Amino acid sequence: MATIADTESGRYVFVKGAPEAVEMLCDMNEEQKADYDKLLDYYRNKGMRTLSFARKRLEACENNTAEVLAAGKLKYIGTAIISDSIRPDIPETVMQCRKAGIKIKIVTGENGTTAREMARTAGVWQDTDCHENEITGEEFAKMSDEEALHIIPKIKIISRATPGDKQRFAQLQRKLGEVVAVTGNNVNDIPVFSFADVGICSGNAETAVKESAGAIIEEDSLFTILAAVRWGRTMYENMRRQMVFRYTANVTLFLTMLLAAIMCDTIPFTASQLLWIGLITDFIAVIALLTLPPSNRQLNKKPRKHTVYIITKDVIRNILLTSLPFTAILLVMLNIVEWLNHKPGILPVLQLKNLSMFFSVFVFLQFWNLLCVRAWGSKNFALHKFFKCRGMLAGMFLILLGQAVLVEFGGSAFRTFHLNFSVWLEMFFTTFLVYAVPEGTRAAMRRFRNKHPKGLITK
C-alpha cells in the first residue's frame, strides 16, 4: 500500500507492506539486506507477523504513485513486529478435528516461515511434514488445475496467498469431492465464500462479510466450529433415526391394513385410531428423536461423502427387519381377536376389550421401537444417558398417557373400552421383547468385538 502526503518537511510517498516487497523498493547495500533478512527470520521463526515501512521524498511535479514505486530507491523506515499468539485450546481442538476427519488447511498472506511456525504451534504442521506439504501462492498460481489437483491432498499451507489463490484452492478441493468450509473476516474473503460449501465468519466481522457468509459464530474460536460440526452430524443422525421410525410404523400399518382386508372381516383400526397413530409417528416421536442431544462420539466418525443418501441399505434393512415381524405379530393377534369375537354369545363389551387390546399392542410396539431407534447407529445401549434426553422422555410419556386416556375414556369415538390394570401390565411387558431382543443382540455383538477387535480369528 502506498500513499502520497504533504508534510512540513516536504512531499513524501509512504509505503507499507510485506517485507520482501518493501525490500525490493528500498535502496539497501548487501550488508543492510543481510541484517534486514536476519531480523525478519528471527521473528518469523517465533511465529510473529512482520510489516515493513519505507518512504521517499518527492518533487512537486511527482504525482504518479506507480511511477515513483517503479523508480525505487526508497528509504527504509522500520518493521513492525506483530505478535498474534495461538490460543491455548487450539492444539487440542486441532487434534479433535483430525480425529473427526476434518483436514485443516492454512491459506494466508503471511511469509512461509511465519505461517509454518503458526501451523506448528497450532498442531496443524507436524514433525513428519516436509516441503511437499507447503507451497507459496506464486507457485500455486503457476500450476495448471491438473497439476494442482495432484498435490492438493498433501498441501497444508499456502503462504503469500492472494484471495484468488484461496478461491481457486476451495474450488479444486470441491473437485476432489471434499466438503469445503472457508473461514474469513475480511472483505476479500467474500468471493471465496460462494465457491465453498459453507462460508464461516465471526460475529465481529464486517456487515458485508456477515451477509455473504453461510454461518456466523459469535465466539471467534475453532472449537465453536468443531461444536457446530458435532451438532450438524447429530442432527443428520437424528433425521435418519426419525425416518427409520416413521417408515417402520407406516410400513407396518400399511401391511396390516392391506393383509387384514384380505384375510379378516374385522377392520384393524378406525379413522380416529389412525389419527392418534399418525400423531405418534409423525409428530410426537419425530420431535422426541430430533431433540436428542449431541454426542461426542460423532467426532470420532469420518465425514460423509456428497454421494451418500439419507436412505441407505442399512435404513431399508432396519425398516424391513422390524416392520415385517411387527406385521406378523399384529396379523396373528387380529385373527385371534376375530376368532374370539365371533364366538357364540360373546358380549359386545368383551369384543371392544379385545379390539382395545389389539389397538394398544400396536402402540406399545411403536413405543418400544422408539427406544430401540434411539440407539440405532450407535454402539451404546438404548438407555445410555436416557434421562438426559428430555425430549425423548416427554415423548414416550405422552404416548403412554395418550394411549391410556383414549382406551379408558375414548368410548365409541375410538372403539375402545376400559381395560384392567393387569391387562395393561401384560401388554406392556409382553411387547417389551421388542426392546429386549435388539438390545441383547447389541450387547452380544459389543462383547464379541471387545474380545475379538479384529474380527473372528480362525485357524
Regions found by a protein language model. Name each.
Residues 1-34, 39-172, 176, 190, ...:
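Cytosolic catalytic headpieces and adjacent flexible linkers of membrane translocases
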